[in-house]
UniProtKB/Swiss-Prot annotation:
The keyword Transferase applies. PANTHER family: THYMIDYLATE SYNTHASE 1 (PTHR11548:SF1). This is Thymidylate synthase. Its EC number is 2.1.1.45. DUMP binds at residues 21, 136-137, 176-179, 187, 217-219. GO terms for biological process: dTMP biosynthetic process; dTTP biosynthetic process; methylation. It comes from Enterobacteria phage T4 (Bacteriophage T4). (6R)-5,10-methylene-5,6,7,8-tetrahydrofolate binds at residues 179, 285. InterPro entries: Thymidate_synth/dCMP_Mease (IPR045097), Thymidate_synth/dCMP_Mease_dom (IPR023451), Thymidate_synth/dCMP_Mease_sf (IPR036926), Thymidylate_synthase (IPR000398), Thymidylate_synthase_AS (IPR020940). GO terms for molecular function: thymidylate synthase activity. Homodimer. The active site is at residue 156. This enzyme is also expressed by the thyA gene of E.coli; the phage and host synthases exhibit striking dissimilarities in both structure and function.
Length: 286
């Protein structure tokens, strides 16, 4: 994952210091791009340990359409009350400030992916890939201007587009706001996993993964952590293996396939030969 280190280096060398919504301060670049060939391995960050279980739990939670942090907790920890999630701080701060309770976060990612004005974008985009693979409208958007003010956190990764290329499935996502230290490794692994899942559903091969970033930043309280990442040597890429799906999976309807996907848990997603440097802790800016 040398690309990740190169981005950090670029921000340090060419970024500008600025204030931000959280009051933490950042070093930022506007407009960044990274690309991975998924046929060469899975792009899990290796210069620090990836929070893999949390990453997969969040993706399944998004795909389920849930917007309640306790549902995420159940997927990740098999408990509605025990264990932390990456959305807890957003719930305790922004969601409660909006008047939400009992774990509700408002119409965030899951709501938009599965019910954007009544449209189930996940079902529609996968059906479109199957029926019209050369179509250029294979897009899912989480950015719903009419509902932004009701969200605990407006979507950072706003929309993504699939592309079918000679039997390979590519995905490009656009992210308006990129927390390079904490968020980006999570996002890379999540969208790479989504490519693998949808490729299985559509009988395609995972192809290219492309990240396009808007305000791409390192928070001031993550500067030393990012410098440590630059001192570490990246390890080899690993391989993603997904289990728990039936043999007949590829022959099912999209709706039936998705039912099986939503029954999967983090233990069903294994990174073979994943070797990383030790974790590096950092506080999330909320």
């Amino acid at each position: 994952m040398k690309q990740y280190q190169d981005l950090i280096k670029d921000i340090f060398e060419n970024g500008y210091e600025t204030d931000d919504r959280t009051g933490t301060g950042t070093i930022a670049l506007f407009g960044s791009k990274l690309r991975w060939d998924l046929t060469k391995g899975f792009p899990a960050v290796t210069t620090k340990k990836l929070a893999w279980k949390a990453c997969i739990a969040e993706l399944i939670w998004f795909l389920s359409g849930s917007t309640n942090v306790n549902d995420l907790r159940l997927i990740q920890h098999d408990s509605l009350i025990q264990g932390k999630t990456v959305w807890d701080e957003n719930y305790e701060n922004q969601a409660k400030d909006l008047g939400y309770h009992s774990g509700e976060l408002g119409p965030i990612y899951g709501k938009q992916w599965r019910d954007f004005g009544g449209v189930d974008q996940i079902i529609e985009v996968i059906d479109r890939i199957k029926k019209l693979p050369n179509d250029r409208r294979q897009i899912v958007s989480a950015w719903n201007p009419a509902e932004l003010k009701y969200m605990a956190l407006p979507p950072c990764h706003m929309f993504y587009q699939f592309n079918v290329r000679n039997g390979y499935l590519d995905l490009q996502w656009y992210q308006r706001s990129v927390d390079v230290f904490l968020g980006l490794p999570f996002n890379i692994a999540s969208y790479a996993t989504l490519v693998h899942i949808v490729a299985k559903m559509c009988n395609l091969i995972p192809g290219d993964l492309i990240f396009s970033g808007g305000n791409t930043h390192i928070y001031m309280n993550h500067v030393e952590q990012c410098k440590e990442i630059l001192r570490r040597e990246p390890k080899e890429l690993c391989e993603l293996v997904i289990s728990g799906l039936p043999y007949k999976f590829r022959y099912l309807s999209t709706k039936e396939q998705l039912k099986y996907v939503l029954k999967l848990r983090p233990k069903d997603f294994v990174l073979n030969n994943y070797v990383s440097h030790p974790p590096i802790k950092g506080k999330m800016a909320v």
